[in-house]
Amino acid sequence: MENLLEMQKNVKAITRKYEEDLIKLNVEVWKDIDGYDNYAVSTFGKVKNTKTGRILKAGNDKYGYLQINLYYDGVMKTHKIHRLVCCTFIDNPDNKECVDHKNNDRTNNDISNLRFATANENQQNRKLSNNNTSKVKGVSFNKKAKKWHAHIQIDGININIGYYDNLEDAKTARVNRANEAFGEYTNACEKL
């Protein structure tokens, strides 16, 4: 019995390594969705009915995320596809609660574009608002001082980085501070 358990562990480890190698080669890998007998999700962000082999058509929620309806015992439940992909294929040892789209494209649910994040990390990697004229989060022109103001929020605390005569210096200061604070979760448009 002990040998059988050891063999099962070895098979699982080999299977996991094989799946990881396929993912690195950008090969589509399918896995069953936990809690559902008839559905599988792929590393490319597709969902299929395993009984019929049919790829299911996803819809958008009001925020632009792709979602899918799955049925179990006649009961329908709606799931966000990015969560299905991430929870199925990516380990989450730190138990981070959010799934982040690295490139901010809510419809790109490829495994290479997803990662687990805390709520704070997820907030750092968001698109700029449309009224941002500096094109960098946390940099604005202060009319009274007639200078560019760089600031940042870390753990809910607003921090003044400084006032600068030109936009480029303010951007550089903000980007450097964001990289220090948030690392890989710094928004792509904030990188120098």
Q: Where in this protein do the model-derived segments appear?
A:
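Short intrinsically disordered terminal tails
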Residues: M1-L4, E190-L192
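Charged, compositionally biased non-catalytic regions
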Residues: E2-R16
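Conserved recognition-core residues within compact binding domains
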Residues: K12-V99, N103-L192
